[in-house]
């Protein structure tokens, strides 16, 4: 149930390290989450204005405080080197890595900190 949940989507471009949002799977994801009542914030280091969604995006990575879930939707290099446990601080959202951007070490550190990390397409339970 997404009703009233705060969800942060990281990456809205259609592929890694570009600012082109045409045909991005993130658009479908964000629209679906919003239809289901979620409050979605999106961030992409290569996109300042998301034309297809008619919205501006923050210039800096938003704080994770108050976020119920974080979705990695584009594997930008900025996200690959992000110290996720440090960035999250005391926050403990669910993390969904849809693009295999988190390293095994990062996944393990998050889980050790009590953060639920889920992945798509890995097949190894990490």
Question: Which stretches of residues belong to each language-model region?
Answer:
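Structural/interface elements that position substrates and couple domains in central-metabolism enzymes
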Residues: 1-126
């Amino acid at each position: 149930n997404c009703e009233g949940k705060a969800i942060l989507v990281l990456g809205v471009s259609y592929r890694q390290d570009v600012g082109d949002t045409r045909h991005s799977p993130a658009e479908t994801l964000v629209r679906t989450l919003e239809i289901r009542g979620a409050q979605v914030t999106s961030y992409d280091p290569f996109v300042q204005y998301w034309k297809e969604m008619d919205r501006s995006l923050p210039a800096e990575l938003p704080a994770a405080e108050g976020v119920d879930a974080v979705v990695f939707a584009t594997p930008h290099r900025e996200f690959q080197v992000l110290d996720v446990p440090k960035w999250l601080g005391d926050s403990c959202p669910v993390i969904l890595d849809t693009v295999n951007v988190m390293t095994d070490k990062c996944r393990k550190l998050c889980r050790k900190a009590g953060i639920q990390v889920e992945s798509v397409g890995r097949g190894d339970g990490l």
